[in-house]
Design a protein with these regions (language model features):
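Hydrophobic membrane-insertion alpha-helices, especially the h-region
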Residues: 25-41
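His/acidic metal-ligating clusters that form di-metal
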Residues: 119-122, 227-230, 242-344
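Extended active-site neighborhood of metal-dependent phosphoesterases/phosphodiesterases
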Residues: 51-77, 145-272
Length: 344
């Protein structure tokens, strides 16, 4: 304590303490007011985007209602004649749901609605990162509210849709974990007679890794013509729970065993004939990175092992964010001869 402070009278000391309390009170009050304003702005923005969804026109669907098989965690879509199933693949919608992402969320809603309106798909498959609960970019930790916004969007568009999780859907600091969000989707899905009656979703078997491993089969004239395997590529490795080091997880061995058993189960149902399939998940296989780096090193031209068949790479310097651990899925795909495409 300084000499001047020692010489203060008791009344002066009380006045000083009172002054400090007043200043502290003003600071705390100002912080509370700022937080209140941000919460209010976030709520207003969220409601504004929800109203935008309510004003959209339904696109609708012309396929028969799919049938859910709870025992095998699978849906079956039936078509007939020369009818083909049109699938729209989306990923990384990144709905923030907070005061920092109001405009971006609106753009995401408009982009999805425009794509669905133009393509008029029979089925939309979303491969993760629907929610983006990163607080310094979204302004919230509430990942359920973000998922619910997308669910309301797809319900309004009135098309069948399915999803898997990405690394951002359930961050370690989010309010709700993976199983809780999976339960929310499942309880609102077609399987449970939920309010999103065109959502095809299942948490999948309890005894394997992940919270959304399930199958969508397509039948035509009593034969299976296509299967879609929806798989959870999980989020981050155990030593990087916050994803700071970009140490991504992968498709685990027991999930690959499940995939193989599903390919063989559907083959048996199809009279012993292998059914063509596609796989949908979020985090790419390491083979994606190997192929992309080889293609890029060759001046973005085909090599003996890599052929760029279709599409446009808009970000030539973008790296493939995959796990450092190799999943056995790619080898299983080659061995079984069913899957013709993998989409992330």
């Amino acid at each position: 304590m300084g000499k001047a402070a020692k010489n203060l009278t008791e009344g002066q000391k009380k006045a000083r303490r009172k002054g400090k309390l007043i200043v502290t009170g003003w600071i705390v009050g100002a912080i509370v007011v700022v937080i209140g304003i941000l919460v209010a702005v976030g709520a207003i923005g969220y409601n504004g985007n929800m109203n935008k969804i309510k004003n959209l026109e339904a696109v609708g669907s012309t396929i028969e209602t799919p049938v859910y098989d709870a025992e095998n965690n699978s849906y079956t879509i039936t078509i007939s004649g020369d009818r083909e199933l049109k699938v729209l693949h989306l990923t990384d919608i990144h709905i923030g749901g907070g005061f920092l992402s109001i405009s971006k969320d609106g753009w995401a809603i408009e982009a999805v609605a425009t794509l669905v309106e133009r393509v008029k798909p029979d089925l939309v498959i979303v491969t993760g990162d629907i929610a983006y609960p990163v607080p310094f970019q979204a302004g919230t930790f509430n990942n359920k509210r973000e998922a619910q916004m997308f669910g309301e969007l797809m319900d309004k568009l009135d098309v069948y849709w399915a999803l898997t999780f990405g690394n951002h859907d359930t961050e370690s600091y989010s309010y709700f974990d993976r199983d809780e969000i999976a339960k929310m989707y499942y309880e609102n899905s077609l399987a449970c007679g939920g309010k999103w009656d065109k959502l095809l979703f299942s948490p999948g078997p309890d005894d394997i890794y992940g919270s959304c491993n399930y199958t969508i089969n397509v039948k035509n004239d009593n034969s299976y013509v296509q299967s879609f395997f929806i798989m959870d590529s999980n989020a981050y490795m155990g030593d990087d729970p916050f994803g700071i080091m970009w140490n991504y997880d992968r498709i685990h061995d027991d999930q690959v065993e499940w995939y193989e058993s599903e390919v063989n189960r559907i083959k048996a149902l199809n009279g012993g004939n292998v059914v063509k399939s596609m796989i949908f998940f979020h985090i790419p296989l390491t083979q994606y990175r190997d192929a992309w780096e080889e293609f890029r090193a060759n001046g973005y031209k085909n090599t003996a092992d890599v052929t760029y068949d279709y599409g446009f790479a808009g970000e030539g310097d973008e790296k493939v964010c995959c796990s450092e651990e190799v999943s056995p899925l790619f080898d299983a795909v080659l061995r079984l001869g069913s899957t013709k495409g993998i989409f992330c």
